[in-house]
Amino acid sequence: MSFTKFCRGCGQTLQSANESATGYIKPLKLSGIFSKGSVSNLLKKNLDEQAIFNNAFKNLNPQIKKHFPNTTSFPFHEKEIGRTDLLWCQRCHDLKFHSRIRPKELLQEPQTTLPDIISTVNNDKSTCLIIQVIDVTEVIFQDFVSATQYTHFPVFHLFTHADVLPPKKPYWLFPGLGISSKYAMLYTSHSFNLVDKLLGRINPLLCSRGHVYVVGEANSGKSTLLKTLAKRGNGVFNELLLDSFLPGTTQAIKGYPTQYFGSCFKQLSEGLIFDTPGYRGNLKSLLPWVDTKLLTSLVPKTRSRNKQLTSKPVQYRVRFGQSIILGGLVRVTPFEINEDGNHEVGKPIMFKKEDPSSTTIHFLFSTLKNKKTKGNTNNMKPLLIKLFTKLPAHITSITKLQSLENSTKNDNVPLVTHSPSPMHSSFTVSIKPTQLSENVFDPTSSGELVIHNFGFLSFSASRPMNLLVESVNPKAVSWRSAKPVVPKFNK
């Protein structure tokens, strides 16, 4: 008897021939599964591995521990032996249970496009509904593309992260995008009432033995939506899906029976729900080189600047030419510029005689307090910073940003505001060491990059130098550099 071999996380077909290819799994796991005589040995091996995992899990930092389920990673019961749909490939297993990510995986950007996904859906004659998941914070009217342009199947548009919109419902959104409110809805996974409302809207569109495809850009919330539906219906999908804010986590189209979602899809008896890879959007992914041990810690937990100044901030060393990522979408890269202080954006950096790997810059990240959000309970949740090269549809005014500029004009600390370049989606700021006297400079160079309404990044260099800081520059917010206002780094 043969079994379908695919990863329960990313959906790729499991293989043990090429370690660098997707879906790789150690040969020992596959060879033991199909041998009846090795069932007892495999169970013992799983028990041993689970014991090791449990011991390691107990020693994790509580702040990191809450992001990972305390569950087994291999088939545990004898009746499940031989079911390879319960296995993880090496990549997904390392990401889910050990927070290990290989640099080459971080540098992958989504290559799939919306037409590519829809062409696969159109070839499935059993398709009854397409749910297009759109992050409402990334909606740009002139760039929005509906899946209805590529298919004759019904498309329901689900706009996620609606909790960041103004209190009044934006009735202008759907007409502005040219879609009917009958097939569109604002949604946030934090409300079960909206989950029930969503099910009430899509269930009439379903048919028995039909297929439902969930499509959307990378990190738009497709997997989170499916997990929320399973949780609402008392299903088991929450246990089977990989959860990560990294782009490209779902690497292949994968179907799940309606039983995984409990009582959610009543009209879809014996049908399938398909999770699809995130397609490439207008804003492309920004991916870093970052110590994976700090991958979770780099997401700030509070917007209160006062709390962060009295607590220990996140501190990280970055070599010149490397990047760090903030909240998943903002990249900041320090560069050393020539002695004459000139560097052309886009040109390669010519390092000095010193070994660049021996010179590091310290980065400290904190967030600013937002006075307008005192009653917002989401303030206590991790803040994912999202910045844009174009103004999102829900940001209609920059009055708050201008008033913030005016309020800082009389500050004792000199501030410099940098305007975005119309030719580039990034800009540069030059940080020079303080000159104490003629030919004598402060032994350290430090500064601060302020992101209005979002946060600030403090940095300190180990010797006098000029630094070039490159970052994505959104038109929705302004940036400025300043002298550091946070405590100095510990030597």
Swiss-Prot record:
Its GO CC terms are: cytoplasm; mitochondrion
Q: Which SUPFAM superfamilies match?
A: P-loop containing nucleoside triphosphate hydrolases
In terms of domain of life, where is this protein from?
Eukaryota
A Gene Ontology annotation in the biological process aspect, one of them, is: mitochondrial ribosome assembly
Q: Give this protein's Gene Ontology molecular function annotations.
A: GTP binding
The record's PANTHER family line, in alphabetical order, gives: GENETIC INTERACTOR OF PROHIBITINS 3, MITOCHONDRIAL
- The name this protein carries in UniProt is Uncharacterized protein C2F7.09c
Organism whose genome encodes this protein: Schizosaccharomyces pombe (strain 972 / ATCC 24843) (Fission yeast)
